[in-house]
A protein has these predicted regions:
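P-loop NTPase catalytic core
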Residues: 1-162
Length: 162
């Protein structure tokens, strides 16, 4: 970046990085806090994330993609929770979506981008909001659709129109 170039930084995996930091911090005498993670783990991950992003005028940018390993799809797990609080957004990959054969298996309803509303036009943001609403409605009624319990009605016309 200091040479004025744009950089793509791929980090696999921030979970293993946090676990390694936990081990060294505990060996150094730090006391565990968040599910055995010392408080310095949040600081170290935040420092790593802050080094990426836009550079100063005339310098390059660093776009970062961090992978987070989540045991049993538990998004409340300490490292996943830390990352969600630090980064500008996250893309959740879903095993269930992959099993249905949809790739990339991105769970659109659980994924978040804090910068997208500023990057899209007002019309695009309306389309995105409407698409997410329709997808949420479909996800809500999909068990009834699979069980063939779907009936006609004003709400169901919205579903079939999606």
């Amino acid at each position: 970046r200091d040479q004025g170039r744009n950089v793509l930084f791929l980090f696999d995996s921030i979970t293993r990085f946090a676990e390694a930091h936990r081990e060294t911090a505990l060996l150094a005498g730090e006391t565990p806090a968040l599910n055995a993670f010392p408080p310095s783990t949040v600081r170290v991950i935040a420092e790593l994330a802050e080094r990426t992003g836009p550079g100063t005028e005339g310098k390059g940018d660093i776009t970062a993609i961090y992978s987070v390993l989540v045991a049993g799809s538990d998004m409340e797990e300490p490292v996943a929770d830390m990352i969600r609080g630090i980064l500008d957004g996250h893309i959740i990959l879903s095993r269930e979506i992959a099993e249905r054969g949809r790739y990339p298996a991105i769970d659109i309803l659980r994924s978040v981008s804090h910068s997208l509303p500023h990057a899209a036009s007002d019309d695009e943001n309306v389309l995105i909001r409407d698409a997410r609403r329709m997808l949420a409605l479909y996800e809500e009624v999909s068990p009834m659709l699979r069980a063939n319990l779907y009936g006609s009605g004003p709400r169901n016309r919205t579903i079939s129109g999606a």
